[in-house]
Regions:
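Short, surface-exposed ligand-recognition loops at beta-strand->loop->(often short) alpha-helix junctions
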Residues: 10-19
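An amphipathic, aromatic/His-enriched active-site/gating alpha helix that lines ligand/cofactor pockets
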Residues: 21-38, 50-51, 60-97
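Short, well-ordered beta-strand segments in beta-rich or mixed alpha/beta enzyme
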Residues: 2-9, 38-75, 109-113
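Intrinsically disordered, low-complexity segments enriched in polar/charged residues with Gly/Pro
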Residues: 14-15, 45-47, 81-83
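Residue-level signal for secondary-structure boundary sites
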Residues: 14, 64-67, 102
Length: 114
């Protein structure tokens, strides 16, 4: 299984806006792309004056081919969603990982970018 963690640095007061975008514009199509929503968290667990919060969105897909299929299915609606999130947040990163004890498949494409 591939775990995906979106790390979004955002002002605490903008978190409801990001979650509304997620609910209205990303979640309706996530299953068709092979994504399963796994959780949403905020850190720190309090709003600190003048400091951003981190919104963590977690997902999973079945395996590496499913991850690349999900990426290939990115369409204009997905791009527009992330552009809208970027307009609200300070920074955003996506982490893609698998179980450390699982054997890693060999990369078969020479010019592949993960």
């Amino acid at each position: 299984m591939i775990q995906i963690v979106d790390e979004i640095t955002v002002a605490p007061e903008r978190i409801p806006d990001v979650l509304a975008l997620l609910r209205d514009r990303y979640l309706p199509g996530h299953a068709a792309r092979g994504l399963t929503a796994a959780g949403r968290w905020v850190s720190p667990p309090v709003a600190v004056p003048e400091q951003p919060s981190t919104l963590w969105l977690t997902w999973h897909v079945a395996d590496a081919p499913s991850y690349y299929r999900m990426r290939a299915l990115t369409d204009g609606d997905v791009v527009a969603f992330w552009m809208a999130v970027d307009a609200l947040c300070d920074a955003r990163r996506r982490h893609v990982m698998t179980d450390a004890d699982a054997p890693l498949p060999a990369l078969t494409e020479v010019d592949h970018a993960a």
